[in-house]
Amino acid sequence: IDYVYQHADYIAVNISSPNTENLRNLSLSDYFSSLIEKVMNKREQLAKGADTRKPIVLKISPDESEENFEKIIVKSMETNVDGLIINNTSINHFKGVKGGISGNYIKNLSEKNLKFARSICDENLTLISSGGLMTKKDIENRLKLSADLIQLYTGFIFRGTDLLKESLEIQ
């Protein structure tokens, strides 16, 4: 955080990358509570020196159990995390396939997790929907499901600026 704070518009704490060994263990309650408290304390220290408070958002795995997902959301609200990115790449996929899956393969899971998160979080916690956003209709649906923002990756890779143009047409 020290290195990026002055340059960033916001800081994403990614505890969900399927490509970093043991990183997802940070979402377990013992590790997560300590980690997020340290991150938020560091942010407050840096905000005082910089006269600006950069938002901290947490990127969550779509593979969390409902129980742990709820614990992460509750702890995020308790520590004043500014937002959650729901979701990252999934590791639950076809037998024998290595790496993470994204795009259409996690669309339904991302929608389910967004609905669940919205049902337990307050309006002060920004929800950023990611995962399976391939079309304008997908984006409209996430906004209807009460996403505050969207984050495009796979859809942008496959559709390029056409998807961006379509998303700007949404009222």
Language-model features: locations:
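Metal-dependent enolase-superfamily TIM-barrel catalytic cores that perform enediolate-based chemistry
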Residues: 1-48, 55, 61
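Hydrophobic faces of well-ordered beta-strands that scaffold small-molecule active sites
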Residues: 11-14, 56-60, 84-86, 125-131, ...
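Short beta-strand/loop segments at the ligand-binding rim of alpha/beta enzyme cores
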Residues: 45-64, 117-129
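Recognition helices and adjacent regulatory flanks at domain boundaries
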Residues: 107-110, 129-141, 151, 156
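Catalytic cores of alpha/beta
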Residues: 64-78, 118-123, 133-150
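Glycine/Thr-rich beta-alpha phosphate-binding loop at enzyme active sites
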Residues: 19-31, 69-123, 163
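A structural motif
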Residues: 8-10, 81, 147
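Glycine-rich phosphate-binding active-site loops on the catalytic face of alpha/beta enzymes
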Residues: 15-17, 83-93, 139-166
